[in-house]
């Protein structure tokens, strides 16, 4: 079975993340989407909440399993899950350069794990969780960029007037 790991912060998960996960599910027999922690980021949602939003959005994709592993190194987790590839989404050239650097480090740490880059569609090429959170803080409707459960939770968390 070909297994891939799709790690990320997913704070919150966006339609771009969902697109990448679904593309990976078409390529690999099993995809683990894992809510992880980047020590250089500050989170609005807990790993459990982030994983829950992903589970809800991807519940109809049989070969995707969502996990939360906030305290692991990506390549160690890939080995633990028997993944042969790490999947990453790329929106633009800045993402590409960043992912290229991370892929190089990961290859040094785990020569048996490959990084697969999947490019976003034009409609998701500008969507970033940090940007969406910023818009939501200013009471902008961000529901077009997020799965429904994540959008509602973001509105509630920030106390937006249009929260349901």
From Swiss-Prot:
Its EC number is 2.7.7.3. Belongs to the bacterial CoaD family. Its main location: cytoplasm. It holds the Pfam family CTP_transf_like. Pathway: Cofactor biosynthesis; coenzyme A biosynthesis; CoA from (R)-pantothenate: step 4/5. This is Phosphopantetheine adenylyltransferase. It comes from the Bacteria. GO terms for cellular component: cytoplasm. GO terms for molecular function: ATP binding; pantetheine-phosphate adenylyltransferase activity. Signal peptide: none annotated. The lineage of its organism: Bacteria, Bacillati, Bacillota, Bacilli, Lactobacillales.
